[in-house]
Amino acid sequence: GVSSTALLVSVLRRFGANPRFAVPRRSEDGYGLSSSAIDRALEPGRPDLFIALDCGTNSYEEVAYLRSRGIDVIVVDHHRSKEKHLEDGILINPHVHAAPGDAAWHNLCTVGLVFKLMHGLLKRLRSENNPAAFRIKLRDYLDFAAMGTIADLVPLQGENRILARHGLRMLQQTQRPGLRALMRVAGVKPTQGILPVDISFRLGPRINASGRLADAALSVELLLNEDDGFCNETALQLDAFNRERQDIERQITEEAERLVESHYANDHGIVLYGDNWHPGVVGIVAGRVSRKYNRPCVVLGNEGEMAKGSGRSVDGINLVEVLGTCCEHLSNWGGHPMAVGIALAKEHIDTFRAQFSEAVRRYVGGDIAEQELALSAWLPVEHIRERLMDELESLHPFGQANPEPIFGIHGV
């Protein structure tokens, strides 16, 4: 969402537009295109066009509300549709409009879709001889596209691989003050090359930290701002948020693992709730717990009368399909096969816990298989030469659906 907003706003500004942007605050608005987030976005005045990024596919009532006020709506999103399609507005979503599974753009995340949307806009305006359209080079925004693509853990295949590979090169030579300041505080040295791991574990967590603990708009401002002083100060602030996030995450993870060991070790799908758990970091905790115990996990935090949180899955278990069979007590939910956000009344947690575990059991048809170490190949020792290293280098960038090869060697 952050990289998508930065890319879209940057390009529109080059056309002389001055778009407002608003980022939902998790603590106040929850996830996605909520009514409170919309009201806050409309406070400065009614726009002619409202563009929802990385949310909105399932926001039927919210989009209808915007349309009722005479506002055109474009939804650019890659989350799965749960029941029906949007009846109002324009929806750009490759998972809704029957895209062939092998299409090069099928698994684009939202920033990739925004990149394509801007590509289409430039082509259209160039055909109309718009002078600004000829001055804008979309490759200058590949750094934003790469960051969002890698951080969102979409398969690095097809067009995602192209965006990531060329975007990483652009990121190495970026002159954006915000990105350069962020690299400095994160210890990323562009002169030594930038890898996906630098985004996943250094830059991405700092960009996301403000949204988890405060306001994600701060990260968007960092990416857009041209003032070195502001960018240096903001990068330090994001770094501080990230350190705070790590401390909170560590504490909740320890508590969550104790709960699993004492109460839910035999559940096929794990649902955990903590009254003092920060909703902004429970998704990371869910990922850690699911990896440790090799089963889907939902971790919930306290938000008034509601419990809100995130779920993470393991290979072979589609969380969207699982939740579709046990969602009767969920007031809101949605996401991807491997990651979802949910909300429900606290009184329904125990019932949902039992239903979720049973739904996972039915989905896998019994017990979840233990994960195995998947070797890419067995290699004779004499094949490990500089040429092999060069060939492996050509396979970069490694990431989701393009993992770094693991080789086995006999008789070492």
Predicted segments with their positions:
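A short acidic, amphipathic alpha-helical/loop segment
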Residues: 61-65, 270, 285, 391
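Hydrophobic helix-and-loop "lid/oligomerization" segment in the mid-to-C-terminal part
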Residues: 1-49, 69-70, 87, 123-351, ...
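A contiguous loop/helix-start segment that scaffolds small-molecule binding in enzyme catalytic cores
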Residues: 153, 173-176, 358-412
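A short acidic, often aromatic-flanked loop/helix-cap motif at beta-alpha or helix-coil junctions
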Residues: 28, 97-102, 382-384
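Hydrophobic residues within well-ordered alpha-helices
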Residues: 8, 114, 167, 238, ...
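Two-component system phosphotransfer/interaction surface
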Residues: 118-119, 346-361
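Active-site cavity-forming subdomains of large catalytic enzyme subunits
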Residues: 39, 43-107, 111-128, 132, ...
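Hydrophobic, well-ordered secondary-structure segments
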Residues: 5, 60, 111, 115-118, ...
